[in-house]
Amino acid sequence: MTSTSSATRPNQKDLEKLVDETPASGPKRSIAFLAGVATFGSLLFGYDTGVIAGALPYMYMPRIAGGLRINEFQEGLVGACLALGAAIGAIAGGRLSDHYGRRHNILLLAGIFILGTLGCTFAPNIAVLYLFRFILGIAVGGASATVPVYLAESAPTRVRGSLIALDQFMIVAGQLLAYSMNAILSSAHGGPQVYVTEDPSGTLTGGQWYPWDQVQNVSSAVITAGDGMAWRWMLVLATIPAICLWLGMRLMPESGRWYASKDRYYEAIGALKRIRDPKLDNLSEEIAQIAELQQREDAQGHWSLRRTASVAWTRRLLLIGVGLACFDQLTGINTAMYYLPKILAAAGFSAADSITLNVITGAVACAGAGFGLYLVSKLARRHVG
């Protein structure tokens, strides 16, 4: 038995018998291990959105010094391309995960993360960087739509709230990791520096290394080398968690809830048995609840956006959700996330110090998310909100 049709969906007795007779579909995995692997997708979300803050100061440097000689307009597009890709990825990611499964979609996204990261790392010019930042954005958006759903559907009720909060924590942890690696690499190189061979104006002494901050406004300086390649090292480090995500998800089961949505209860039970503790979790009761919920959803039919907006209680939920998302964006946090080193540099800090100080914002965000994770583990999610 591998699947059932909606017309012959098993009843309570059939489900109990199926639970007794169905073996686990593979090796047992703890829910902590599953969450740790799946949230590599969230970590990548955070890393790829945060890493650009430290990379941009190096991209401003001339090509001979390892940079891309970008201007302010191009700097804005580097961030915008990822955001555009993320918007498309979030929509497409949800649809693909509904059709092909959460696990399969995360595996696909891991591959896109690797492709996008390597494409950005080895981009020979700004146009190619735009393209692969857009591709990377698709993976970021897809992860934001798929990973929380996979966690929610895989987690037992007793820890579901905490695991969903863990997703958000790992996003800001990824940003902190990006800021930290940016600071480490920048410090190792001594900050953005160029080698000036000569300067006919006499402003600079030839044959010396100078901070890029000091040289960028001296048009007569002849630059022959620099440490601008540091931005490529910052970006390529994201391949490590992406590979871990791809390898780890190959060891994980598909979402049992997704199997049930396709009336494949045999596979659903087999998948859930891999990640449930028989001493703590009542699988018969859980699968019965899933089947009941699926019947209700089938009876309600498809909920379009128009239908959601026309019903009072769903309209209220929609407005609250959209309002919170808009408020989050209007706070300007994305500006700080992408451009804080530039803002600090404009305030008088050196480029190297600005990249290092950015770690503080990541640490504060991580502490806040950690506190939220603690509250969710102690209180109801609605009360925390």
PLM segments and residue spans:
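Transmembrane-helix signature of 12-pass secondary carriers
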Residues: 2-277, 282-285, 291-385
